[in-house]
Curated annotation (Swiss-Prot):
SUPFAM superfamilies: P-loop containing nucleoside triphosphate hydrolases, PRTase-like. Pathway: Pyrimidine metabolism; UMP biosynthesis via salvage pathway; UMP from uracil: step 1/1; Pyrimidine metabolism; CTP biosynthesis via salvage pathway; CTP from cytidine: step 1/3; Pyrimidine metabolism; UMP biosynthesis via salvage pathway; UMP from uridine: step 1/1. Keywords: Allosteric enzyme, Glycosyltransferase, GTP-binding, Kinase, Multifunctional enzyme, Nucleotide-binding, Transferase. InterPro entries: P-loop_NTPase, PRibTrfase_dom, PRK/URK, PRTase-like, Uridine_kinase-like. It comes from the Eukaryota. This is Uridine kinase-like protein 5. 5-phospho-alpha-D-ribose 1-diphosphate binds at residues 317, 342, 368, 373-376, 439. One of its GO terms (biological process) is UMP salvage. Uracil binds at residues 438-440. The keyword tRNA-binding does not apply.
Length: 465
């Protein structure tokens, strides 16, 4: 969607299907970086993605908008200026604008006039979108810019095709003659491509050959984006988080177990149902091999045979509530136990552990229904690693998780898989999950009534004395 008027490239364009005055999205946007050599078809790829995401608010940011304005001395020698070098861009302003868009703030992005080689301030703010596409030859070169992206794309097009497109674009749209274009290409464009642009291809998640002519690649990219847009923000950051598909039935069960007025009997019943779903989902992440069997009709059925070397490890007390569901799904499974004592807000002490002797050769389901700060989980996972369990063989199962706990685990153990049914908002000052469901173990095992009776008895004794 590249538009040029009097040599000025529009700094940021919003999908024609949505009004620019639409309110900013509440969820963190999905950021896509599209890089490639000059005239490789980056803009065409961006246009195709935007047209297929017509039901989403899409913002396109061009790296060309962030060129430095040239001084009089540089203007006099403009043909000696390398526009394809990283130093030609004002990356600090680019980073500032992208951070504001990602945080849901409107921002003024400059435009760049290629005829006078000056940056022009924008008078109208650009609102953020559900999807932000950052396009430019060097958007994958700077690690600070790469870190802002959820998906990185490199458009790979033949050098001869890129040169012919560049000649046509610069002569028709930017008022240059063919000789100057060829001189600039030989002196700056080609060397910069070899030194900076092509090496950045290694950072791309997806490489698109033939650019906009590759309809299959564009369709697959759009499908992936749509999937990510439906996910929680943390799932866009960490690929090892898996949330079971939310339905009205699952939402209804969450409503019941979170309700303070729910009886113990109902709490246990619906918690067990949710735990069973989480366990079943976790089993789907185990390795498998193809297996052929014969059915009672004499037909051959090609299916799969799941990993047999599996065990569970429950974090006492609340983790024990998940053992029955695991046993119901995996008959005869070995289950170990870990007891971790909380010393203070961020301290944990291992009190007890009893694990299968051959645990290092097994895949492990770590069981704890609530992931809060993540300190206990880190302690438990560290113990499993010390026993020789590969990090990639650990699947952490829980019902609800707080963002703080997810960050703590995923940053420390990137090969670990986390399977949960919902991600909650945050933690309060007492490190309890909000909105949460209270003390899970007390509600599940019925010990909250015992605690209240002990507290009441203690109060009565004090009053009598």
């Amino acid at each position: 969607m590249e538009k040029l008027s009097n040599g000025v490239r529009d700094h940021c364009l919003i999908s024609d299907y949505v009004s620019p005055s639409a309110p900013a999205p509440l969820k963190q946007p999905f950021v896509i970086g599209v890089a490639g050599g000059t005239a490789s078809g980056k803009t065409t790829v961006c246009n195709m993605i935007m047209s297929q995401l017509h039901d989403q608010r899409v913002v396109l940011v061009n790296q060309d908008s962030f060129y430095h304005s040239l001084t009089k001395e540089k203007l006099n020698k403009v043909h000696e200026y390398n526009f394809d070098h990283p130093d030609a861009f004002n990356t600090e302003v680019l980073l500032s604008c992208m951070e504001k868009l990602r945080s849901g703030q409107p921002v003024n992005i400059p435009s760049y006039d290629f005829k006078i080689h000056q940056s022009i301030e924008s008078s109208s703010p650009v609102n953020p979108g559900d999807v932000i596409i950052l396009e430019g030859i060097l958007v994958l070169n700077d690690p600070r810019v790469r870190d802002l992206m959820n998906m990185k794309i490199f458009v790979d097009t033949d050098a001869d095709v890129r040169l012919s497109r560049r000649i046509q674009r610069d002569t028709v749209e930017r008022g240059r003659n063919i000789q100057n274009v060829l001189e600039q290409y030989t002196k700056f464009v080609k060397p910069s491509f070899d030194e900076y642009i092509q090496p950045s291809m290694k950072y791309a998640d997806i490489i698109i050959p033939r650019g906009g002519d590759n309809d299959v690649a564009i369709d697959l990219i759009v499908q992936h984006i749509r999937t990510k847009l439906c996910q929680h923000n943390l799932c866009k950051i960490y690929s090892n988080i898996f949330i079971i598909s939310s339905t009205f039935q699952i939402k209804g069960m969450h409503t019941l177990i979170r309700d303070i007025n729910t009886t113990k009997h109902d709490f246990v019943f619906y918690a067990d149902r949710l735990i069973r779903l989480v366990v079943e989902h976790g089993l789907g992440h185990l390795p498998f091999t193809e297996k052929q069997i014969t059915t009672p009709t004499g037909s051959v059925y090609t299916g799969v045979d799941f990993c047999k070397r599996l065990c569970g490890v429950s974090v006492i007390r609340s983790g024990e509530s998940m053992e029955n569901a695991l046993r119901a799904c995996c008959n005869g499974i070995k289950i170990g136990k870990i007891l971790i004592h909380r010393e203070n807000n961020d301290g944990r002490q291992l009190i007890y552990e009893k694990l299968p002797k051959d645990i290092s050769s097994r895949h492990v389901f770590l069981l704890d229904p609530v992931l809060a700060s993540g300190y206990s989980a880190v302690k438990a996972i560290t113990l499993l690693l010390s026993k020789g369990v590969p990090e990639s063989h650990i699947i952490f199962l829980n019902l609800i998780a707080a963002p703080q706990g997810i960050h703590a685990l995923c940053k420390k153990f990137p090969m670990l898989k986390i399977v949960t049914s919902e991600i909650d908002s945050s933690l309060n000052e007492d490190s309890r999950v909000i909105p949460g469901l209270g003390e899970f173990a007390d509600r599940y095992f019925g010990t909250n009534n015992i605690n209240s009776k002990v507290s009441s008895l203690s109060t009565n004794l004090k009053l009598r004395s």
